Amino acid sequence: MEDPNRMMAHTGGMMAPQGYSLSGQDDGQNTGNENEVRKQKDIGEILQQIMSISEQSLDEAQARKHTLNCHRMKPALFSVLCEIKEKTVLSIRNTQEEEPPDPQLMRLDNMLIAEGVAGPEKGGGGAAAASAAAASQGGSLSIDGADNAIEHSDYRAKLAQIRQIYHQELEKYEQACNEFTTHVMNLLREQSRTRPITPKEIERMVQIIHKKFSSIQMQLKQSTCEAVMILRSRFLDARRKRRNFSKQASEILNEYFYSHLSNPYPSEEAKEELARKCGITVSQVSNWFGNKRIRYKKNIGKAQEEANLYAAKKAAGASPYSMAGPPSGTTTPMMSPAPPQDSMGYTMGSGGYDQQQPYDNSMGGYDPNLHQDLSP
C-alpha cells in the first residue's frame, strides 16, 4: 500500500500545470478586452473632434488645417481617399450636354423685351409705351390731346418705375448668385487639397447652384410681367373702353343731328367736315349717326327733351362747334317736333330705307311733297 504523503505529492504535481494554463487564458482575454476598449475610446475621441469642428473659431480651424497639411502622413491619407473614391463614387457622364433653355423663362424674357422692361438699354420702353398708347386711341386723332398726353405720361412713369424695380432686384439676384457660387468654388478648391475633387465636379456643382437660383429669377420675371399687364389694363385698356369720343366731339355730332332732325342722314361732304372737326374718321361718323338714329327711335320722348335742350342752346347763341349756320331770317328745324316714327326714313327690320317712307332714293334726297311741313 502506497504512502499517503507520496500520493498527495504526486497529485499536487499534476494539478499545478492545470492551474497555470487557466491563469494564462484569463490574461489573454483581459488583454483583448483592453484593446477593444482603447479602440472604441480612440474612435469616440475622433468623433468628438469632428463634431467640435463647427464650434471652432477661424483661427483654430486654420491652425488645424495647417497641421494637417504639414503632417507626414497626409500623402498617404490622400492616396487612400483616392482609392476609396475610385471604388465608390458614381461615374460622371463624359458628355455633359447643356440643358435646353426653359420655355417658360423664354416667354417671360420675350414679353419683358416687348414691353420695354428688359433689353440692352435699361432706360428703354418708350417705343412700347408709344405703341400701346396709339393702340388705345383706336387709330384716331383725339381732340382732348392734353388729357391723352397726361395719361400717357402717367403710364410711362409707372412703367419706368416697374422697370427700375425689376433691374434693381435682378442686380441683387445676380450679385447673390455670384457671391454664393464664388464661395462654393473656393471651398471646393480648398477641400481638393485634402480630398480628391476634379474640375468637372466643381463645374457640375456650379450648374446645380445656377439651376437652384433660376427659380428665383423666374419668380421675379413672372411678378414683373404681371405688374406690367395690370398697368396696361388700368391705363390703356380701360381708357380704350370708356373713351370713344371726346365731349367736344359729342357736342358737334349731337348738334348736327338735332339740327337736321328731319333728315338725319349727312352727306359725304358733311361727314368729312364732321370727321375733321371731331378728329375722328368718316366711318366713325357714319357709325355714330346710325346708332344715334336707332336710339332716337327707341326712346323718342327722351330724345325730344335732348333736342329741345340743343334748340335752347341754339337760341341763346350760336355754338362754336356748329357747322355753317342758316342765314338770318330763315327758319330752322331745331324747334320742330320730332317726326312720327313712320317718317324717320328707315326701318329696324330691313336695315335700310323703306320705299313707302318720304325719302326719294332715286333723287338721292328728301322729297318735300311726301313729307309734312314741320316748320312753325
UniProtKB/Swiss-Prot annotation:
Alphabetic keyword roster: Developmental protein, DNA-binding, Homeobox, Nucleus, Transcription, Transcription regulation
Q: Which CDD domains match?
A: homeodomain (cd00086)
Q: Region labeled PBC-B — which residues?
A: 127-237
Q: Where is the PBC domain?
A: 38-237
- PBC-A, as annotated region: 45-124
Give the source's domain of life in one word.
Eukaryota
Listed GO cellular component terms? nucleus; transcription regulator complex
Instruction: Identify the SUPFAM superfamilies for this entry.
Output: Homeodomain-like (SSF46689)
Task: Tell me the segments the record calls region Disordered.
Answer: 16-35, 318-376
Matching entries from Pfam families are given as:
Homeobox_KN, PBC
Q: Where in the cell is it found?
A: Nucleus
Renumbered to this chain, the Polar residues biased-composition regions fall at 20-34
Q: Where is the composition biased (Low complexity)?
A: 318-335
Which stretches are labeled DNA-binding?
A: 238-300
Q: Name one GO biological process term.
A: peripheral nervous system development
Q: One MF term from GO for this chain?
A: DNA-binding transcription factor activity, RNA polymerase II-specific
> What does the sequence similarity comment in the record state about its family?
Belongs to the TALE/PBX homeobox family.
Stored PANTHER family: HOMEOBOX PROTEIN TRANSCRIPTION FACTORS
Share what the entry says about its subunit structure, partners included. Interacts with Ubx and hth.
Name the job this protein performs. Transcription factor which acts with the selector homeodomain proteins altering the regulation of downstream target genes such as wingless (wg), teashirt (tsh) and decapentaplegic (dpp), thus affecting segmental identity. Delimits the eye field and prevent inappropriate eye development. Required for proper localization of chordotonal organs within the peripheral nervous system.
This chain belongs to which protein, by name?
Homeobox protein extradenticle
Q: Which organism is it from?
A: Drosophila pseudoobscura pseudoobscura (Fruit fly)
